[in-house]
Amino acid sequence: MQAPFIDWAQEPDRYLREILGDRADGLNPLRSMWDRGIVIADGSDAPCTRPDPIRGMHLAVNHPNPAQRLTPYEALLMRTRNAAWLGFDERERGTLAPGKRADFTLLDADPLTIPPQSIGDIRVTGLYLRARRIPPQAGGVAHVILRALAGGKSRK
């Protein structure tokens, strides 16, 4: 799934409603899939949408169709445990446990305890790859993502 498509600017809600009518309410059926036991993960489909996990979590929890909203915990699982499991990488990633990679972020608020509508305001205050703190990068998010994909190494 790609929760960021819930508010994708290239397909505004008005446009989808003109074409699909009431069926537009069934787009991105997160809750329906979750309740049927389908393991779903969330991604951004960058560069079509921003590679912003916090925004994806916010959209999954604040889905415009209330019947399709996930809890904050479920939205977090989509980006962590479920993503690792679907990528056949659950032995190394997805949860924090001895022997795993220990890739994680520090946030300025707990998405499980703040009001759901505030999740999108959370800011990342630290990034760790393989349990090593990655200092803030001048290149911003794109540089950090590329570094993470390279296993924590930068090309010079």
Can you name each region flagged by the protein language model?
Residues 1-113, 122-130, 134:
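His/Asp/Glu-enriched, well-ordered alpha-helical/loop segment
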